[in-house]
């Protein structure tokens, strides 16, 4: 997949802007606050229908404006043209269109334009809460496996229903134990499917991650493993076997769950463990080591997508090279040369000779950040 051009109107600090990136590596440079990240965010909207930074649409409006429009033109590996339009108005909400047809729900669009991102705030994947790592997992799998996304959404819906029933039972305001058993069985089956797919994905991702991390961090053991709130999950466990174990666990903890009015184990409570030479990098890695670990994860994700999907992903990397030395920066650029279309932002336009440098202030329509 390749972005041909993108145009924005009333988005962030851009009242009108157009951008045509190169096929390979494009370095979009400019001073801090000039709107470089906003360009990546607009592309991210076209790919995944939401902000790169996790911001609500209302925060993406240009100052004093009532609406924004993002229009992107893409071309697939087979030469098929894709037109994406994302618009938002205070009075009507968000609208996503693909080739002039409305997309509903928005989740139907996920995976159409594969996209891999890096932003400084994503270091929380390595050193933040378990929720950040689960989000990384779910975002990656949702783009590459439609069935996973559907099952994850079903899991979240059933989890919400079960928690609501636990609250009803705890407060004696309705519900029945028979109904709880039914929701428990449904949740256990979905939990088994989500968990097993996550574990399988990490095994596939590790094939690409470990050599990349070795090239950036040096020889040693670099591992990404799944940490289940359920306990150890034996290799080769079937979905039915794991479902039965979840049912047993839910029944064992039912009294505590009624007291807390929440489901205490399952994929929504799981985590990832990142190890470098046997030590948890979240606790013992320096900022530079943690950043290199995250970059290796993202580059591994590119290779995973490239081998699994019919379309090569677009890479959107925001301020990736700060805190990295010249040797690591050069090594990453060498890897990026094989990564299809990559758009980087930086304050320095002379990072690497293989890249095309474009000043954000020189883009058509630019009026200042």
Swiss-Prot record:
The keyword DNA repair applies. Keywords: ATP-binding, Cytoplasm, DNA damage, DNA repair, DNA replication, DNA-binding, Nucleotide-binding, SOS response. ATP binds at residues 30-37. GO terms for biological process: DNA replication; DNA synthesis involved in DNA repair; double-strand break repair; SOS response. It comes from the Bacteria. GO terms for molecular function: ATP binding; single-stranded DNA binding. PROSITE patterns: RECF_1. It is found in: Cytoplasm. One of its GO terms (cellular component) is cytoplasm. Pfam families: SMC_N (PF02463). PANTHER family: DNA REPLICATION AND REPAIR PROTEIN RECF. The RecF protein is involved in DNA metabolism; it is required for DNA replication and normal SOS inducibility. RecF binds preferentially to single-stranded, linear DNA. It also seems to bind ATP. Belongs to the RecF family. NCBIfam families: recf. This is DNA replication and repair protein RecF. It comes from Chlorobium luteolum (strain DSM 273 / BCRC 81028 / 2530) (Pelodictyon luteolum). The gene is recF.
